[in-house]
């Protein structure tokens, strides 16, 4: 995968910090599904958990609402998220011990004492998704759980079809092979999410507010936006207006012993 400008990506996410949760409909559904996947595969209490790329804390809240966690380490590229996320945690789960590690998760070295490593809608931005699994295996105790999602190559295919813009996502088979190196009892579940919008312009606003357009470096002019909207309406109309498809792959693995 070509290296992404992570500083630019982080800056664009932060620029829509206060609006992200309002527009991140698919991402919130993914977070809910990840917690369900974890619940279906373990009933253990996690003494130490690590969440990579916590952002505004939506996965954090959902995990703590249903999963017993004693000590939670949060990570994100930007520390601006931490006070808000910490406040949410202390309001609902005041007994949970929380700390924060700022920085690029691909460059940080985590301690080797975690029971759970989680990451929601984050790994697709990494330069080396496979290395993420190696790092997770390093950070986990034997029997520890890695829980995360990526997206299939068909993700946001409507946008890619019209613009040629998109990330290079590993396939489910690639993920399965990578997981099998350090993890067992692996679960990989594809659950497409089709969102509907009133108009193509609403699609563009959704993408901008959720940071998905961070992969594109150049803003569009008025003519390009008008042309995109005409083509989108022609190709992807539905009864509710137009649609946009996310294709998440939910994944869970248990670290092998030895």
From Swiss-Prot:
PANTHER family: TRANS-ACONITATE 2-METHYLTRANSFERASE, TRANS-ACONITATE 2-METHYLTRANSFERASE-RELATED. Keywords: Biotin biosynthesis, Methyltransferase, S-adenosyl-L-methionine, Transferase. It comes from Haemophilus ducreyi (strain 35000HP / ATCC 700724). GO terms for molecular function: carboxyl-O-methyltransferase activity; malonyl-CoA methyltransferase activity; S-adenosylmethionine-dependent methyltransferase activity. Disulfide bonds: none annotated. Pathway: Cofactor biosynthesis; biotin biosynthesis. One of its GO terms (biological process) is methylation. Belongs to the methyltransferase superfamily. This is Malonyl-[acyl-carrier protein] O-methyltransferase. InterPro entries: BioC, Methyltransf_11, SAM-dependent_MTases_sf. SUPFAM superfamilies: S-adenosyl-L-methionine-dependent methyltransferases. It comes from the Bacteria. It catalyses: malonyl-[ACP] + S-adenosyl-L-methionine = malonyl-[ACP] methyl ester + S-adenosyl-L-homocysteine. Its EC number is 2.1.1.197. Converts the free carboxyl group of a malonyl-thioester to its methyl ester by transfer of a methyl group from S-adenosyl-L-methionine (SAM). It allows to synthesize pimeloyl-ACP via the fatty acid synthetic pathway. It is an enzyme of class 2 (transferase).
């Amino acid at each position: 995968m070509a290296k992404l400008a992570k500083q630019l990506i982080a800056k664009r996410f932060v620029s829509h910090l206060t609006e992200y949760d309002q527009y991140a409909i698919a991402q919130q559904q993914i977070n809910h599904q990840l917690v369900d996947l974890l619940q279906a595969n373990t009933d253990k209490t996690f003494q130490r958990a690590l969440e990579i790329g916590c952002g505004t804390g939506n996965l954090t809240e959902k995990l703590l609402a249903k999963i017993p966690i004693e000590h939670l380490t949060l990570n994100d590229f930007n520390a601006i998220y931490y006070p808000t996320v910490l406040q949410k945690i202390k309001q609902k789960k005041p007994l949970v011990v929380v700390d924060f590690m700022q920085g690029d998760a691909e460059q940080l070295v985590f301690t080797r004492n975690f029971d759970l490593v989680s990451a929601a809608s984050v790994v697709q931005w990494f330069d080396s998704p496979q290395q993420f699994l190696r790092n997770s295996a390093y950070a986990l105790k034997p029997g520890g759980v890695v829980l995360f999602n990526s997206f299939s190559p068909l993700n946001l295919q409507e946008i890619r079809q019209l613009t040629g813009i998109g990330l290079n996502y590993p396939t489910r088979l690639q993920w399965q092979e990578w997981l099998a190196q350090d993890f067992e009892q692996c679960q990989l579940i594809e659950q497409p999410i089709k969102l509907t919008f009133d108009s193509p312009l609403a699609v563009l606003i959704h993408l901008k507010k959720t940071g998905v357009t961070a992969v594109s470096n150049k803003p569009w002019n008025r003519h390009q936006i008008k042309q995109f909207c005409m083509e989108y309406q022609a190709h992807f109309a539905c009864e509710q207006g137009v649609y946009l498809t996310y294709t998440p792959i939910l994944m869970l693995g248990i670290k092998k012993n030895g």
